[in-house]
Amino acid sequence: MEHHCGLITSNKETVPLKNISVTLSINEFVAAVVATLNYENEEKVPLEATFVFPMDEDSAVYSFEALVDGKKIVAELQDKMKAHSEYEEALSQGHQAYLLEEDDYSRDVFSCNVGNLQPGAKVAVTLRYVQELPLETDGALRYLLPAILNPRYQLSEQSANSCLNIQKPTVPLEDLPYTLNMTATITSQHGIERVQSNCSLSPIQYLTDDKTSAQVSLTEGHKFDRDVELLIYYNEVHSPSVAVEMGMLDMKPDSLMGAPSAMVSFYPDIPEVEASKACGEFVFLMDRSGSMDSPMSTENNSQLRIEAAKETLLLLLKSLPMGCYFNIYGFGSSYEKFFPESVKYTQDTMEDAVKRVKALKANLGGTEILTPLCNIYKASSIPGHPLQLFVFTDGEVSDTFSVIREVKLNSKKHRCFSFGIGQGASTSLIKNIARVSGGTAVFITGKDRMQTKALGSLKFALQCAVDNISLSWDLPPGLSVKMLSPEQLTIFRGQRLIIYAQLTGLMPQVESTGAVCLKHILQGRSLENRVTFSLQPKANDNFTIHRLAAKSLIQTKDFGSQEASKEEKEDVMNISLQSGVLSSFTAFIAINKELNKPVQGPLAHRVIPRPVMAGSSSMRFYSSFSGGFKGPQPRSLRVPAYDLCSAESANLVLKKSACSAIQKKKTNSSTNKSNLKKEHKAFGENAVVQLISLQKANGSWELDEDLTKILGTKSKDIKAANPAKHEDPSAWSTVLAVVWLHANGTDLKCEWELLERKAVAWLHDHAGSSIPMLVQAANSLLKLSVNPAVFGV
């Protein structure tokens, strides 16, 4: 019997979205983006087309327009409920209508509706947005164009109003009916060193001799198998800067959009200092949902996410300081924790945790992060040990606002370091839980190693806090400052600080300057950064700084319709409508009243498909929440436009041509399962990881059979070569392990740097003056030449 898979129409209609075109303008560390979606209705009936797509959470969307038969229709930003009502009314009257909105449950998911698209009609829908570009640890500015929207697990009590509930069709990459092209123009007064990408780019074209302007494009034939990531390297990215922007002339001079705005960017040179060795409670909250059984990337031999997570937890455990407290949680539809409450870090507790880490599996179903978070926050605080929370998730959570609100409510008692794993992780969730708690957010995509990025954040967590942060302004008489950004509580070494402010009063008519100084105290030492700026800015019709400032204000107040109070909602609405920046309470709507063709019966509804990546696990998760939707379906889903198959994979929306291949894969799944597993690196395959797993909690190594195998030397030869037999035998084996690491694990040094420090500190306490002699003997035995300076001698 033939099985029909997915959504199949009787006459095999084509999808109305034909092309997505993105123009990107990057000036210093701000990106201005223009995205155009080109639609064409090749059917014989009017259509309503819906396209659900991801966008970075920091994006400030400020313009939405449609071009129909040469006529531009500019959308108006309205209260979301009013916009929905007008959209429905326009369609009922035969007008053409367009609606753009954020999802009710996540700020990084948007839906675009094109209603009453007539047969043969072509429409270009354009949206514009601006965003800050995050800074990577190597100094690169990172722009991400999300192409992947992962399925989001459904909370059982969630409303059906979310656009995440729409059954978004999926098709194989080769059958994707629309294309993407992107061109990026980059300018920086400091000069552009290079541009890198995870996708194929055209050769970089420098537009000026001094390399302050450049252009790159995606090559033709780009597949939607990954997010599009650009890494931009400037020659002097660490230079502080201040940009001033004049307000809109038609707005009140003292209003948000009428007064001049300033954007301050500091990159303080904070020296690295050693934190207290016994300070902190470290709780690691690890995603163990089914999606963690996916590969880290599409590259061959890529680790599964859960295997990378296990190695990451091992490295974190080995790098913790003696005397601290820790616990590990795993979460999915339910959650598990290693210990009833956080325990003191000792050899026994560390060994117990390592055994449990090695046995972890991605077997806890969906992604319900809120319940374990509440459990962590309810636990009693440990005096003298501030809570440091590390959250690892692929971001497949639908109701992000509830999670963000819970983290914010507990922000005074902890810092949260968040990690978005894989392409499609929710930027709204990952960025905001870090932002509201004073932590850092990290995204792990492509060839990134989870282990490297996690250890980098642990270094931040172990650093002493920067206290008494303050800003002082030096401005001409008659000019004052109103801060728009929330108070910054913490600055980490290597972290950039962006501040928005409003300049009130009279701007000077002649050339003049202002200055701003960032002051802070680190371990009793006063530090400061000062920068001077011009008060005669160039005109900017996009009002980029004003809109970014408005977005910053919205982010501090907007926690969605389910979480916001009446006062918060009104405040967000006022900021959104005044600035023209989209929020969760507003929506863009445009109506073409010149089209006045009454609709006969319901509009046929077409949901634009998204791609299925090779090796993606997204297919197997649709069925896991397909029956969990409560309440009435959205209006657009009540239109009987498709015949759904009755197969168990009914929520997989694939073209019929792809179904036979999937059926073959099902038939051979049992025989190929073991082979599939072999394609991915298993936990502990790396010899460096094997060596690290043998380290004791105090930082030392003991000489045993496992260590001798890694060193590649017989036990009797090792014992005979020990030049300090009167010392603790562990001193000799610890020196051998550290020497071996420096010779064989240099490419992963950032991952074992903390545990090496612990080993060296232990050696100084237990071997002292014998260290130089031990290092020389270790080099001789292992035939290496590691510099004794790495041991601090």
From Swiss-Prot:
Name of this chain's protein: von Willebrand factor A domain-containing protein 5A
Modified residues (Phosphotyrosine): 622
SMART domains: VIT (SM00609), VWA (SM00327)
Matches recorded under InterPro entries: VIT, VWF_A, vWFA_dom_sf
Function of the molecule: May play a role in tumorigenesis as a tumor suppressor. Altered expression of this protein and disruption of the molecular pathway it is involved in may contribute directly to or modify tumorigenesis.
Domain (VIT): residue spans on this chain: 1-131
Keywords of the record: Phosphoprotein, Tumor suppressor
Keyword set includes Phosphoprotein: yes
